[in-house]
Amino acid sequence: MRALSLHRDHAVDAASGLAFDEAMAQLAGLPELPQAHLRLYDYADHAVLVGRYQRLEDEVDLAMAIALGVTVNRRPTGGGAILMGADQLGVALAVPAGTFPTPRQGMSRFAQGVIAALASLGVKAEMRGKNDIEVAGKKIAGVGFCTSGDGLLFHASILADLDTDLLLSLLRIPLAKLAAHGTGAVEDRITTLAELGAGRAELEAALVASFCSQLGLGVVDGEGRDCLERRASVLAEQRYSSEAWLFAQGAAAAGELAVEVRSSQGTLRIIAATQGDVIKSAVVAGDFNEVTPELRSLEEALRWSVLEPGALGRVLAAAPGVSGLAAPEELAAALCDAHFGRMALAGPRRIGSCYIPEEITL
């Protein structure tokens, strides 16, 4: 069915909310359902959602979340940790996988759809980096994507308003580092619809018009919802209510290296198991959007490599695509420094999250 089905939801819980989004992607393009699905919604106060490839323990103060009754879950899409609630507008668009030449090009088009909607309200926004939409240098939204089944899912979280004190209390990186400067340090880096004088209802209408125009589809209300809810109920129980999903990236075990470095695809956290001065295995986590061939090449190159800066640097330089992520000699030095105990975390540290534009500090 050549149509865009519009779904509106309010105060959803994290597990069912994420499951419905993924169900839209899995069923996008089925002949008996609309070709695309657009969902505009918000979460019950409050939920922290980490990105697909992040390590939960690095991003969220779990003890504080439990104390405050804040739900924690993991998105199917990449990117950084976000706080969702009544004051954050969630946008999910699901289309068949072949709609765009590549998923990354699809995310760019999706971001442009959000930017066009903001522009129709007189808000001039632009894309910055891999995930950020900014207004006058301040972040107003983050975007991400994933593939699921034969569909593509695009996520955006748009700030209608924000409780910066709550944000600071829940997110470990980088907000704990900014806490010494007070909430003003956060507020200087973000903006909201409320601050810009833009109405949420008007933006929702503009988003519908923008994506219908972009995809060349007419809108229908809630078509196929029963089918989506049946699929979502299974995903909510089997995936989004599972601790295995929540802690999917795992923590570094005793004796393993844990090194955080900046790369062209975002912040990478390399976790390596060693035997003597040799890396037995390595896993890369982080706020990237997808596991690319370059990231897989990095993991493969690290396996059974000797932790000596010169030798490891040469191995990484020879690995396909690794030099495009970060300087091989810097990666090698970071791992060797951590291994030999000179630094607990080596290399550039991230000052940034899903709602804080990234900076680099040495």
Per-region residue spans from a language model:
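A conserved active-site cap/scaffold subdomain adjacent to cofactor or substrate pockets
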Residues: 182-222, 232-237
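A structural signal for small-residue-enriched, beta-sheet-centric alpha/beta enzyme cores
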Residues: 139-200, 269, 281
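N-terminal lobe of the biotin/lipoate ligase/transferase fold
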Residues: 1-105
